[in-house]
């Protein structure tokens, strides 16, 4: 067991054993993802991806307060996942998504440490943990979460966050000088029209799987130097909601860029039914046409209850850096007490 893995175990024990007298909120959520579909390329499939495998898990969330209000928030979210595309001995693993503590310093300032979103783009302000449609994060940074420390504060009417992380994503390892520095400044999440500006600099690793335990093998032993600037926005327009982001920069000197636009519509006669359309583009080498991905994805989402949601999506690759594909996915997602 590595030093970092031992630290996570100690953190979890402390997390659970903190005194109950100062608990303001204490919730234990259960989670399940059942997903499958049909692909032109692979025929009947489970979804091979960074966060959409079949899985069961939980989220344990606690908030602590004193006479002056809440001062500490702790969150652990993990799941046992199954990847049907792997051999039996490699098909199961544990994904630690959230494992962080955040301490309020007052005046809108706080400090966070653990496993959390890098401060870049839409991912820190959206919950895409169990959804079919994803942000640019996995293609842009290479992962959605990383291990490290972050500081949040206020700059006039804007929120800002600065994060320093180890550049490994889900896995708990550093190699070849990996690190990740990110920052984002944007409007408060309570605003009807939200927008943000982000910056990124680092050397990141790419894992062959998204497991935290066991630690996945690296695709390459060398880290990739990344520089990015990005913009993002969200806007509620009556029954419509619009999300968009774009990022550009370089990977080891190669120009990279991409964008995502997503439009959602809530059916007025059936508020539990939502229709979404997403276009996502990413190029890992702007000068090489074969390095680009462009996917169109309409998704129908129906909320069965406050805890269960059914999603049906069609993903059509217009361009792909690997083999172009068309696939239909059906997902049942449960998240409740």
Model-derived regions, located:
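Outer membrane beta-barrel
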Residues: 26-35, 46-167, 177-179, 186-194
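Transmembrane beta-strands of outer-membrane beta-barrel proteins
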Residues: 27-36, 70-76, 109-111, 160-162, ...
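Transmembrane beta-strands of outer-membrane beta-barrel pores
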Residues: 34-42, 55-57, 62-64, 78-84, ...
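Solvent-exposed loop/turn segments connecting transmembrane beta-strands
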Residues: 45-50, 68, 82-93, 141-146, ...
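Outer-membrane beta-barrel architecture
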Residues: 57-61, 99-102, 150-152, 184-186, ...
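Detector for outer-membrane/organellar transmembrane beta-barrel domains
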Residues: 70, 155, 186-287, 334
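Transmembrane beta-barrel architecture of outer-membrane proteins
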Residues: 95-97, 166, 179-181, 201, ...
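Outer-membrane beta-barrel "beta-signal"
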Residues: 324-337
């Amino acid at each position: 067991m590595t030093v970092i893995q031992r630290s996570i175990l100690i953190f979890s024990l402390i997390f659970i054993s903190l005194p109950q007298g100062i608990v303001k909120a204490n919730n234990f959520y259960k989670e399940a993802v059942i997903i499958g579909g049909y692909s032109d390329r692979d025929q009947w499939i489970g979804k091979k991806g960074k966060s959409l495998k079949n899985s069961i898990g939980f989220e344990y969330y606690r908030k602590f307060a004193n006479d002056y209000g809440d001062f500490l928030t702790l969150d652990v979210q993990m799941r046992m996942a199954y990847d049907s595309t792997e051999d039996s001995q490699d098909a199961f693993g544990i994904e630690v998504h959230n494992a962080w503590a955040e301490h309020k310093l007052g005046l809108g300032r706080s400090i966070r440490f653990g496993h959390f979103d890098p401060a870049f783009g839409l991912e820190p302000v959206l919950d895409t943990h169990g959804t079919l449609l994803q942000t640019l994060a996995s293609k842009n940074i290479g992962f959605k979460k990383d291990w490290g420390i972050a500081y949040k504060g206020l700059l006039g009417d804007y929120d800002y966050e600065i994060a320093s992380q180890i550049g490994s994503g889900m896995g708990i390892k550093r190699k070849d000088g990996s690190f990740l520095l990110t920052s984002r400044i944007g409007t408060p999440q309570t605003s009807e029209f939200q927008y943000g500006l982000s910056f990124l600099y680092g050397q990141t690793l790419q894992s062959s799987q998204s497991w935290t335990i066991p630690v996945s093998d690296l695709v390459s032993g060398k880290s990739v130097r990344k520089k990015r600037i990005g913009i993002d926005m969200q806007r509620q327009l009556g029954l419509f909601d619009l999300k968009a982001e774009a990022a550009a920069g370089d990977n080891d000197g190669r120009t990279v860029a991409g964008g995502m636009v997503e439009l959602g519509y809530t059916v007025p006669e059936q508020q539990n039914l939502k229709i979404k359309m997403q276009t996502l583009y990413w190029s890992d080498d702007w000068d090489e046409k074969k390095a680009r991905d462009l996917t169109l994805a309409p998704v129908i989402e129906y909320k069965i209850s406050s805890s269960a949601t059914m999603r049906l999506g069609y993903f059509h690759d217009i361009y792909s850096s690997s083999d172009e594909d068309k696939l239909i996915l059906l997902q049942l997602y449960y998240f409740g007490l």
